[in-house]
Amino acid sequence: MAQKKASLACTECGSRNYSIGVSSTPKPTRLEVNKFCKYCKKYTIHKETR
């Protein structure tokens, strides 16, 4: 099975800064990662969007 692309969006400003490959099987929760946002200029939580 091929992976689908998903974006990681900043929870503070909403910009989609990162893209990741996720499996196509549905999951009950979405991925949350602490990453650097170049627009906020700080580390924030980024949530998976589709």
UniProtKB/Swiss-Prot annotation:
One of its GO terms (molecular function) is structural constituent of ribosome. The keyword Manganese does not apply. SUPFAM superfamilies: Zn-binding ribosomal proteins. Keywords: Ribonucleoprotein, Ribosomal protein. Transmembrane segments: none annotated. One of its GO terms (biological process) is translation. Coiled coil: none annotated. GO terms for cellular component: cytoplasm; ribonucleoprotein complex; ribosome. The keyword Ribonucleoprotein applies. InterPro entries: Ribosomal_bL33, Ribosomal_bL33_sf, Ribosomal_zn-bd. NCBIfam families: PRK00504.1, rpmG_bact. Belongs to the bacterial ribosomal protein bL33 family. This is Large ribosomal subunit protein bL33B. The gene is rpmG2.
